[in-house]
Regions:
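Extended beta-strand/beta-hairpin segments
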Residues: 1-46, 57-142
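Alpha-helical metal-binding/catalytic segments enriched in His/Glu/Asp
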Residues: 48-51
Length: 142
């Protein structure tokens, strides 16, 4: 895979992707940018959420029929000193509908361990949470 990233002045870049889409990136004002695009660190969290979301929905297959909502909240904690890389990433699935919670957990676990290329490419441990119909559900340790 290859992307072409073009400088547009100051801290602004546009990446042209093989899928045909473009992504606009910029730094925040405190890093000399204008805040006119996603920051690269935001893109990492977007990538983690998108990758695990796609994998989980693929793994659930027909079990998605009775799910009405899947929101994925991804939060990264960063080091104070340079480089201010992520030290931890927490991902919470907020799900509504009829599905066995452990079946959903199995899809999260399998997606993370076997399929999600984004999370496999990152150093920090990524942890997951599941909120099903407003209730936090722990994964069974089986």
């Amino acid at each position: 895979m290859k992307v072409n990233t073009i400088w547009r002045g100051k801290r602004n870049f546009i990446s042209e992707c093989p899928s045909g889409f473009e992504v606009k990136m910029d730094a925040t004002e405190n890093y000399g940018g204008d805040g006119q695009g996603l920051t690269p660190m935001e893109l990492i969290l977007v990538g983690v959420a998108g990758c695990i979301g796609i994998d989980v929905t693929m793994l659930l297959g027909k079990n998605l029929e009775n799910i009405t909502k899947i929101d994925i909240q991804t939060e990264g904690s960063r080091r104070e000193e340079m480089p201010t890389c992520f030290t931890e990433i927490k991902t919470t699935f907020i799900v509504e509908g009829e599905i066995d919670a452990q079946r959903f957990w199995k899809a999260i676990r399998l997606g993370h361990k076997k399929y999600c290329a984004v999370s496999a490419s990152l150093k920090p441990e990524i942890t997951y949470n599941l909120i099903l119909n407003g209730k936090g559900i722990r994964e069974n340790a089986s």
